[in-house]
Design a protein with these regions (language model features):
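C-terminal motif of bacterial Sec signal peptides marking the signal peptidase cleavage site
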Residues: 23-25
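Predominantly five- to eight-bladed beta-propeller fold
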Residues: 32-38, 88, 171-234, 248, ...
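Beta-strand-rich domains and repeat architectures in extracellular enzymes and scaffolds
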Residues: 52-88
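Conserved beta-propeller blade repeats
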Residues: 57-72, 107-125, 144, 151-169, ...
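Short, solvent-exposed loop/turn segments at conserved positions within beta-propeller repeat blades
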Residues: 82-87, 127-132, 207-211, 271-278, ...
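Beta-propeller blade signature
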Residues: 89-94, 136-138, 214-221, 277-286, ...
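Cap/lid segment of the alpha/beta-hydrolase catalytic domain
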Residues: 268, 450, 457-580, 587, ...
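Active-site-proximal cap/loop segments of hydrolase catalytic domains
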Residues: 522, 527-528, 535-732
C-alpha cells in the first residue's frame, strides 16, 4: 500500500497521461491547448495561494544532462483548468549561459526526453501523429522526425548508445489470457462481463482484461525503428515493467548496447497476489537468451564478505543500472518476502562471477535512484530524517585484498527533497522540492553538496502570493523517543493570535512526511487558508532507521496512534494554537488513522476528513488486490484464529469502535480505487449517518486512489476546505 515515491518514478500512470494530459482514449490527437497561467488582477491583489492558482503552476520534470554535461533537457507541464487537461513541452538549457529554449509547442504532448550518445540528437515521446510514438530531433534545432510508427501507443523507450537498437513498451493482448466476455464469446460482442478463475482480477485502478505491458527490441536504421521482437514472449501474461506503476526506470541498456536488463515479476493469479518476488533479467541480443540474475542455478550471493549459495532473493528486486564498463549491474533489493516497504538495499551483481554483493549492509536507510559515476563510485538518493538527500558510495577495487564497502557519504544537507538527479560531464543537476516550493532544478556541487538554483518555473506566481513558513519540531513520544514533526504556519503568522490547527495523518503507512510538494495534499495551500498544519513522522515512516520503520507492522492501532496524539497535544500547548478548533485529516493509511482516531480522540477534534481510508479490516481483506501487503502489515487473514498478531489487528479495526464516534466526518473516495475500494468509504458513511453524526460522502467516479484531474482537484479542495471552515474554523 506504500504510495509511489516521486524519487522513484520517471513516469506515473498511463491513465493519468492519457486523461489528464489530454490524450483521451490515446488514439486521437488532442486539440492544441491554450495555456494562460498568468494570475488575474484579483488573484494578485489577494496575494493568496488557492487551488485555482495552484493549477496555473508549471510542473517541471524529466531532467537529463547531455553526455558532456553542457546542456540540460527537461519538460514542463501546464494545465488549462477550463479544458480540464494539460500539455507537456520540451525545454533546453545551456548550462554555461543559462539560456533556455523551448523545443516543442503546446499543440501536442512531448515527454520522456533522452540524449543520443554523441549529444547531437534528442529522442522523446510525442502524440503529434495521433498515437504516442518515439520521435527525434536535432538538439541544435529543427523539425522532429518520427522514429516509430506503430498502431498502438509506445509507453516507454530507450535507445542504446551505439544507436542501432531501441527498446520500447506497448500494451498487448495475450492469447489465452482473455477475461472479457466479448472476447471469450465472439458471438456475443455486446456482452460486458469480466470472468476470472483466479485472483488479481483488479489491480490499482484497472480490471485485468488480458492485456499486459510487454518489452520489445527493434533495430534502428537511419532514425527509423523496424518492427520489434517481444522479448517477454507474446503468450506470456506478465508485465514489463512491473504493474501497476509501469516505471520504465526498471529497464536499462548495457553501455555496449548488446544486453538489456529489466525487472519482471513472473507470477500470476494467487501467487502474484501473495508475493513481492520480482527479479532482474538480462536479455542478450546476440543469442536471444534471457537470464534471471537473482536466481541463477549456481548463484552466489555475498553479504558482508560472506558468500552464501542459492539465496533466492524472495522480495522486490528492481531498477538495474549498468556500470560504465558493463561488468556490474547495480540494483535495489528487499530481503523480506511479501514486505513491500522493506529496506531497499543497494546490490551489485558481477557479470563475470555471478556474485551479488550487498553494498549497504550497515546503512540504515533506503537507497533509491542509483547511478554510476564511474566503475567504482555510485550515487543515490536516501530518505534521511524527513528529507531526501544525495549520497555517494565508494567501492573497493575488484582486486582489493579487503572487499569491505565503506558507509555511504551523505553529500547534501538541508530541509529539502532531492527527488531525482542527472549526472554527466562531472556535473550533477537535481530536481528539488520543499513544502514551499514546487519542483525546480538545482546544480549540486559533488564535493560539498552545495545547491545552486537553476530554474524558476513559477517565479511569476511566487512573486504575487504569500506562503507560510515551515518549522521543524521534535516531539517527545509516549515511549520516550523523539519524533520529527513539521509545523506549517499560515502566511503573516502572528503568535499573538489563535489559529485553527490540523493534524495531518500520513499514508503508506511506510511513507515519510518529507519536504515534498504535493498537488493533492498541499500543506502550503492548507496554511494559506488560515490553518496551522501539524505533520508528524510517526512510527512506521522511513528515514529514521529500520526500527522506527518496522514498528508499525502488526500494530496499526498502537504506538503510531499515540505518536499522532503526542504531536497534536504538544502543538496545542502553544498559545497561538486554538485547541478548541482542531481538525484531523488523512488519506489511505492516513484515512484509516482518521477512522481509528474518530473512535478514541476524546473530543480533541471538531472535524475529521478521511480520503480512501481503510474502515473495516475484514471486508478490506476480500476487496483489495495485493494481499501480500495485508498479510504482512495485519499479520495474516481474519480467519487465522491461532495467529495472535492477526487477531489483534482485526480486533482493532476502526469499524469496531463506531459506537464511540461523535464528530462530523467528510469521507472521500475514488470509484476506480481498487487498492482501498470505495466500498470502504460507503461502509464508513453508512455507519456515521446511522449513528446520527454529520457526514458527507464525495465519490469521484473517474478517479482512483488519488485525485489527478484538474477540475476534480478543485472540487476536492472546495469540499475539503468547506468542511473544515464549517466545523473547525467557525466552531463555537
Amino acid at each position: 500500500m506504500k504510495k509511489p515515491n516521486s524519487a522513484n518514478m520517471k513516469k506515473f500512470f498511463l491513465l493519468m497521461a492519457c486523461t489528464v494530459l489530454g490524450l483521451g482514449s490515446c488514439t486521437e490527437r488532442p486539440q492544441p491547448l491554450e495555456i494562460d497561467n498568468a494570475l488575474t488582477a484579483e488573484e494578485i491583489a489577494a496575494g493568496r495561494f488557492t487551488p485555482e492558482v495552484m493549477w496555473k503552476m508549471g510542473r517541471l520534470g524529466g531532467s537529463q544532462l547531455s553526455p558532456d554535461g553542457k546542456r540540460l533537457v527537461y519538460t514542463v507541464t501546464y494545465y488549462n483548468l477550463g479544458e480540464n487537461r494539460g500539455v507537456t513541452a520540451l525545454y533546453l538549457r545551456d548550462m554555461a549561459s543559462g539560456e533556455v529554449r523551448q523545443l516543442t509547442d503546446h499543440t501536442s504532448n512531448n515527454t520522456s526526453p533522452a540524449w543520443s550518445a554523441d549529444g547531437r540528437t534528442l529522442y522523446f515521446l510525442s502524440d503529434r501523429s495521433g498515437t504516442q510514438q518515439v520521435w527525434h530531433m536535432a538538439a541544435a534545432g529543427g523539425e522532429p522526425q518520427q522514429v516509430t510508427a506503430f498502431d498502438a501507443d509506445v509507453e516507454g523507450f530507450g535507445v542504446n548508445k551505439p544507436g542501432d537498437a531501441i527498446w520500447y513498451v506497448q500494451t498487448v493482448a495475450v492469447p489465452g489470457a482473455e477475461k472479457c466476455s466479448a472476447d471469450l464469446y465472439k458471438d456475443m460482442p455486446r456482452s460486458k462481463a469480466h470472468i476470472y478463475d483466479d485472483l488479481m482480477a483488479r489491480h490499482w485502478n484497472y480490471w485485468d482484461e488480458g492485456r499486459y505491458r510487454h518489452l520489445f527490441i527493434a533495430a534502428l536504421t537511419d532514425g527509423k525503428a523496424a518492427e520489434g521482437v517481444d522479448i517477454v514472449g507474446a503468450d506470456t501474461a506478465w508485465d514489463v515493467p512491473t504493474a501497476p506503476y509501469f516505471d520504465t526506470a526498471e529497464i536499462a541498456w548495457s553501455n555496449a548496447g548488446d544486453r538489456l536488463a529489466y525487472t519482471c515479476k513472473p507470477l500470476a493469479g494467487t501467487d502474484y497476489a501473495l508475493s513481492t518476488d520480482s527479479d532482474i533479467f538480462v536479455y542478450d541480443r546476440a543469442s536471444g537468451r534471457t537470464v534471471n540474475i537473482c536466481k541463477p542455478m549456481e548463484g552466489r550471493v555475498r553479504f558482508n564478505a560472506m558468500v552464501h549459495r542459492n539465496t533466492p532473493f524472495p522480495g522486490y528486486d528492481k531498477y538495474p543500472v549498468w556500470s560504465p564498463d558493463d561488468r556490474y549491474i547495480a540494483f535495489r533489493s528487499m530481503a523480506t518476502p511479501g514486505y513491500e516497504a522493506d529496506k531497499e538495499r543497494l546490490m551489485r551483481y558481477d557479470c563475470r562471477t555471478a556474485e551479488i554483493t550487498d553494498l549497504t549492509p550497515s546503512f540504515d536507510y533506503h537507497a533509491t535512484n542509483v547511478a554510476w559515476a564511474d566503475d567504482r563510485t555510485l550515487w543515490f538518493i536516501a530518505p534521511m530524517e524527513g528529507t531526501y538527500q544525495l549520497c555517494r558510495l565508494a567501492l573497493p577495487a575488484p582486486d582489493a585484498t579487503c572487499g569491505t564497502v565503506d558507509l555511504p557519504t551523505v553529500v547534501t544537507s538541508g530541509d529539502h527533497d532531492i527527488n531525482a538527479f542527472t549526472m554527466a560531464g562531472g556535473r550533477i543537476v537535481a530536481e528539488v522540492t520543499t513544502m514551499r516550493m514546487a519542483t525546480e532544478q538545482f546544480e549540486v556541487d559533488p564535493a560539498d553538496g552545495k545547491l545552486t538554483q537553476l530554474s524558476a518555473v513559477n517565479k511569476e506566481i511566487y512573486d504575487h502570493i504569500r506562503l507560510g513558513t515551515v518549522e521543524k519540531r521534535w516531539v517527545e513520544t509516549t515511549d520516550g523517543k523523539r519524533m520529527l514533526t513539521w509545523v506549517v504556519l499560515p502566511p503573516d503568522f502572528d503568535p499573538a493570535k489563535k489559529y485553527p490547527t490540523l493534524l495531518f495523518c500520513e499514508g503508506g503507512p511506510q511513507s515519510v512526511v518529507s519536504q515534498a510538494w504535493s498537488y493533492r495534499w498541499n500543506f502550503a495551500l492548507m496554511a494559506s487558508q488560515g490553518y496551522v498544519v501539524v505533520a508528524p513522522n510517526r512510527r512506521g515512516v522511513p528515514s529514521f532507521g529500520q526500527e522506527w520503520l518496522e514498528q508499525i507492522s502488526g500494530d496499526y492501532s498502537g504506538q503510531n496512534i499515540r505518536d499522532y496524539l503526542s504531536a497534536i497535544d504538544d502543538v496545542a500547548r502553544e498559545p497561538w494554537c486554538d485547541r478548541d478548533r482542531l481538525g484531523c485529516v488523512g488519506a489511505s493509511y492516513g484515512g484509516y488513522s482518521v477512522y481509528f482516531l474518530a473512535g478514541c480522540h476524546q473530543k480533541r477534534f471538531k472535524a475529521f476528513i478521511a480520503h480512501c481510508g481503510i474502515f473495516n479490516f475484514e471486508s478490506m481483506y476480500g476487496q483489495t488486490e495485493e494481499l501480500f501487503f495485508i498479510n504482512h502489515d495485519y499479520g495474516g487473514a481474519y480467519w487465522e484464529k491461532d495467529n495472535p498478531t492477526a487477531m489483534r489487528s482485526y480486533a482493532n479495526s476502526p469499524h469496531k469502535f463506531v459506537d464511540r464516534w461523535d464528530t462530523p466526518i467528510l469521507i472521500v473516495t475514488g470509484e476506480y480505487d481498487f487498492r482501498i475500494p470505495y466500498t470502504q468509504a460507503l461502509e464508513a458513511f453508512t455507519a456515521a449517518r446511522l449513528h446520527g453524526i454529520p457526514a458527507r460522502l464525495v465519490a469521484f467516479e473517474d478517479e482512483a486512489h488519488q485525485v489527478f484531474k484538474p477540475q476534480n482537484s478543485v472540487v476536492w479542495n472546495r469540499e475539503f476546505f468547506g468542511w473544515l471552515d464549517k466545523y473547525v474554523k467557525e466552531a463555537r
